[in-house]
Amino acid sequence: SQWTYRQDIRNEEQLWKNFKYILEQNNKAKLNDTPLSESEFAKVKNDLSHASFYDAGKWLVGENGKVYVHVQRGNETLHLVVMNNEHIAGGTSVYEVINQYQAFKTEENDERDRRFDVTLLINGIPMIHIELKNKEHSYMDGYRQIKKYIAEGKFRGLFSNIQMFVVSNAVDTKYFSAARDTELNKKFITGWIDEKNYPVCDYMDFAKAVLKIPEAHEMVTKYTVLDNDKKKLLILRPYQIHAIKAMRNASKQGKSGFIWHTTGSGKTMTSYKATRNLLMDIPSIEKTVFLIDRKDLDMQTKMAFQSYADNDTIDVDDTDYVDTLIKRMTDGNRQMIVTTRQKMQTMISNRLKEGTKEYQIIKNLRVAFVVDECHRAVTPETKRKLEQFFNNSLWYGFTDRKSTRLNSSH
């Protein structure tokens, strides 16, 4: 499933019409094969026109991977699925490309129509917008143009759902997350690097690496974080994405390993998204535990994790007491737990009694541990004890010590 070029979608009316068609096709049974009425669709249009890209991001998180719009029909509320983020590269997902779209005239005296270069639609919704320049111009001209369009209010209606921008002059290509014009910052413009750390600058190479399916859909779902404190949309950088993919691939093979990082590399966000994605992507994992040393569990890390999780589809529990940890480990919910190595040790050494129900439940949990600053948070002896206790555990350690750099190990 790749992109279909839709030459026929050039204005707002055609864009909404296309979205309506896809929505109705994907919800035939719920709609009882009766198309949405004008008033029903007016409600949908209103719900999909967001005040900010961040608000759109909150809505696009959905419920258990599904993004809904709710329509009242008689006495019944219809919960229509707009997008299913579990159907990446298949299922109900529809991928389309439009270009030369005529953007809104914001004032009667707009001298000329603004024409957008290229936009990628998922299920009829603009999600990634691309501005292209020729080689004589800098990609920064594309950035400034997008900033101007945002300031002019061009990204509204269905276009208010954009999550990611791409700018290129064919030989230099960058991406950044959608934000208000006053919040856009040059320092968040990011180039792509491949797994071997080589820059990917050419726009066609960038498209193959980042904008094909499933990668493009994953960029705006799996690799986007909503920071509730700052009310900002954040898209991970390439090295963060490669680290998360490596963890996912290792866990599918039942392997553990280390992730090497440098100071200031966005480790908190990488570790959050990695811990979260393991839970979302690997159905066999029942709990993911972000394990940290008591000295390192500062308020900043806890607050950052909570801020990222506030708009996410999973619960993050930071456990203040060992009793709370036991309760979380035995509650049967698939969730992400943030706790300290000391509490985990106390739980298995002093609190759990062999033969009890909670002992059996916790011992047999299929759990993935993500360890922060693993070179000092968990000694080899501690890890051995924890591994001996848990029958089914995987381990991923973040470290800034190059000597421990591994791709994966048993």
Predicted features along the sequence, with ranges:
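Conserved helicase motor
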Residues: 295, 316-326, 341-346
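Acidic/polar loop patches that form or flank catalytic/metal-binding clefts of enzymes
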Residues: 5, 312-318, 396-398
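Conserved motor-coupling elements within RecA-like helicase/translocase cores
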Residues: 322-337, 361
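ATP-dependent helicase/translocase motor core
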Residues: 2-287, 296, 300-312, 332-336, ...
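Phosphate/diphosphate-binding loops
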Residues: 151-167, 318-320, 368-371, 375-376, ...
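Short beta-strand-centered segment that lines the nucleotide-binding/catalytic pocket of NTP-utilizing
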Residues: 290-292
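Signature of the SF2 helicase/ATPase Hel1-core->accessory helical subdomain module
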Residues: 139, 342-356, 362-408
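Acidic, glycine-rich active-site loops and adjacent beta-strand->loop/helix elements
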Residues: 294-295, 402
